[in-house]
């Protein structure tokens, strides 16, 4: 039976939303044990006695908050829920780490406590985002784990994301593209030009460059980019989506009766659109390249995205994704 180490104190709605999601996922994930780290008194109060089977609570006295400097926090807050959970994974007492807390601290836990897979130059952060073409969306890697990149890093990230798309998203032969400032072969700075050449030489189903305006069109299953560009791209997508949804809601509700009637008539279409661009069902962002699954969900998440992230982690464990990475990179050295 696999065990997921969960930072129960991370995020704005902790610990209640996390525990409610665990209780919702527990009947479906019959081969998973959940280890919750944090304020034991608060956590235990939220778990009915009849639901405590396969749930372990580990008491911790500290919490890493968003304002903490990541590396300093994991060194100084040794008894924080996130750090103790990471050490459980490192010691083999748990098989995966999940948190809604400080992203930088979680990345630091993954890289410095759980550790890199041998042969992986740099771990990278990868979410799944919605696209207009497919309900499965697309993966984009790296979105901020690395401020500086080399062409060889991008190739490894593409290889890891390709495995993920095959094993977790069930895409037999994922298409892989490089995010660049033009579709032509010779576009980009030296980093992207060299990465393009190296990607062409791999066995990946590499389809070339894609531009930023093509991302949401679903032209590729996997988009690889440097961490600086990826982070800026992700935040631009999230910010744009948030503004559009807010403006649409304001337009429909604050301009008299006609827009409200129109919204009622358009409700089936709007519902379908909302479902297509619902990111909750994709789960969390994954730190690929470390010795166990490390997954981050947005700090404002409620029960639903947390629930889907638990299902995502279960799939990663059942498919032995990290084992596949270790085998591949040991053979390629």
Curated annotation (Swiss-Prot):
Family annotation (Pfam families): FA_synthesis (PF02504)
Query: Subcellular localization, per the record?
Result: Cytoplasm
Q: What is its EC number?
A: 2.3.1.274
Note whether Lipid biosynthesis occurs among the keywords: yes
Q: What class of enzyme is it?
A: transferase
State which pathway it belongs to: Lipid metabolism; phospholipid metabolism
Q: Does the keyword Metal-binding apply?
A: no
Q: Name one GO biological process term.
A: phospholipid biosynthetic process
Q: Provide this UniProt record's keywords sorted from A to Z.
A: Cytoplasm, Lipid biosynthesis, Lipid metabolism, Phospholipid biosynthesis, Phospholipid metabolism, Transferase
Q: Which reaction does it catalyse?
A: a fatty acyl-[ACP] + phosphate = an acyl phosphate + holo-[ACP]
Q: GO molecular function terms here?
A: phosphate:acyl-[acyl carrier protein] acyltransferase activity
Going by the entry's taxonomy, the superkingdom of the source organism is recorded as: Bacteria
Coiled coil ranges: none
- GO cellular component assignments: cytoplasm
UniProt xrefs under InterPro entries: FA_synthesis, Phospholipid_synth_PlsX-like
Q: Which family does it belong to?
A: Belongs to the PlsX family.
Describe the protein's quaternary organization and the partners it interacts with.
Answer: Homodimer. Probably interacts with PlsY.
Q: What does this protein do?
A: Catalyzes the reversible formation of acyl-phosphate (acyl-PO(4)) from acyl-[acyl-carrier-protein] (acyl-ACP). This enzyme utilizes acyl-ACP as fatty acyl donor, but not acyl-CoA.
User: What is the protein name stated in its UniProt record?
Assistant: Phosphate acyltransferase
Gene coding for it? plsX
